[in-house]
Amino acid sequence: MRVTLIAPDRSLFDGEASSVVAPAYDGLVGILPRHAPFLTLLGTGPLTITQGGSSNRFTVDGGFLQVVGDTVRVVAERADT
């Protein structure tokens, strides 16, 4: 699936991934390919994007996560590596 992670000042990730684990406002949410359409507000915490055997970990604070088709968009109020 295609994943993008952006913050107001930069793009942090844009590529293919096998899974995403993100801090929703009410707990962690896991996204795999072919996930149902989904929209949630983000809380504060680690966001992990897995590509095959490697993972990219970011810290996000606020924003939203959207799943449409095979695309996951993460728009964070604040994000860092």
What are these regions (language model features)?
Residues 2-81:
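Compact, glycine-rich, soluble single-domain proteins
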